[in-house]
Design a protein with these regions (language model features):
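Hydrophobic anchor at the beta1->P-loop junction of P-loop NTPases
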Residues: 1
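P-loop (Walker A) phosphate-binding loop of NTP-binding proteins
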Residues: 4
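ATP-binding Walker
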Residues: 7
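Walker A/P-loop
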Residues: 10, 28
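ATP-dependent small-molecule kinase phosphotransfer cores
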Residues: 29-93, 107, 119
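Conserved phosphate-donor/acceptor-positioning beta-strand/loop module used by diverse small-molecule
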Residues: 95-131
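Small-molecule kinase domains that catalyze NTP-dependent phosphoryl transfer to phosphate-bearing small molecules
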Residues: 121-171
């Protein structure tokens, strides 16, 4: 499951994994493990959007090795069997699996992020604009991916602006079960 920051990937992925009885692994979780290996102390969903998290993301831009290692670890987990993975680039890096893109405007994602992180919607829009731009540049540089623009790898695209995360999860679950039958 992929999509722009704060579109609901993690929440939806947890619901999908629980319903399908499979483990869930997040690219952010693996990246946080690597941040710990680098001496950081990540914590909370909003860690990326504040002090140390943003500093780590800046350091990460100096070398593609961080992201390539995260992606290698996720691809390894994917090859082990049924698993729900949240990741920005993995859908472009493998032909295997059912690939889902969650779509949402900056406005709806900012509202979601504001509720989650307890910061103002305007500040969230600014943070998301920076993250969106940086993710696009990063994955273009590392893999040649037009992140957020090229949706060809995806089997299912779900627009999340007008429906809640539970409904998004239901749509994904129904699609996955239909593909399994």
């Amino acid at each position: 499951i992929s999509g722009m920051p704060a579109v609901g990937k993690t929440s939806v992925s947890h619901q999908v994994a629980r319903s399908l009885g499979t483990p869930m692994v997040g690219g952010g979780d693996v990246l946080k493990e690597m941040a710990v290996e680098e001496g950081y102390t990540p914590g909370g969903e909003d860690w990326w959007d504040k002090g140390d998290g943003m500093k780590f993301l800046q350091e990460r831009k100096r070398s593609a090795d961080f992201d390539k290692e995260v992606d290698a670890r996720l691809l390894k987990k994917a090859k082990q069997g049924d698993v729900v993975i949240t990741s920005y680039p993995i859908p472009w890096l493998t032909k295997d699996g059912i690939k889902v893109w969650l779509s949402g405007t900056v406005e709806s994602r900012a509202v979601r992020m504001s509720k989650r992180d307890g910061i103002g919607v305007t500040e969230c829009k600014e943070i998301l604009s920076v993250r969106d731009r940086e993710n696009h540049m990063l994955y273009k540089k590392i893999y040649g991916i037009e992140f957020g623009e090229d949706l060809k790898p995806f089997d299912l695209v779900v627009e999340t602006d007008s429906i809640d995360e539970s409904r998004v999860a239901e749509i994904v679950i129904r699609y996955v079960k239909g593909r399994r039958d």
